């Protein structure tokens, strides 16, 4: 007898949380001028970025959750795919020490997509109750975090406090809150799947 298939959403959410957590600590370390700590994020970012990209690709194109009645392939799979890709690109750019170019602007475009997803969740009533609150928290904080990535064009001055440094800390907090929402949803999904498999 084979075990019933349970969708991979739980681990995808944990992968998303790991990715946004890496992004959050990039801004934290950058605000403090800790270049060695930023360099230490490169390999985890590439690894988690690959996982998020492949997970998003699988959800977007194989669509393992047809019975849910909600288009999670567009709502979650597509932005996860693009997030993983941007995480890899960002890590390679840091590793190669090249200028940011348009990369932060690509993050803004993804943030707008995620913000549109948040609006759709509410307007189309795709989630209800506790799921609505956590989903909206995840989408809104991740969208704002993605839209604020262009602050990376401005470098905080070492050993000085200023608006740019504070903005880096604000971005760290926003991405950190998004990370917590992803972890909460992922851990609750794991428990739910284990307690009532299909």
Model-derived features: positions:
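N-terminal topogenic module of multi-pass integral membrane proteins
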Residues: 1-61, 191-198
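Membrane-proximal helix-loop-helix units in multi-pass membrane proteins
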Residues: 70-144
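Membrane-interface helix-boundary motifs at transmembrane edges
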Residues: 29-43, 95-103, 155-167
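Terminal transmembrane helical module of multi-pass membrane proteins
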Residues: 121-198
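Hydrophobic alpha-helical transmembrane segments and adjacent interfacial helices
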Residues: 21-28, 49-65, 86-94, 111-125, ...
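Transmembrane alpha-helical segments of multi-pass membrane proteins
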Residues: 39-51, 80, 104-116, 168-178
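A cross-kingdom feature marking solvent-exposed beta-strand/loop segments within repeated
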Residues: 61-76, 162
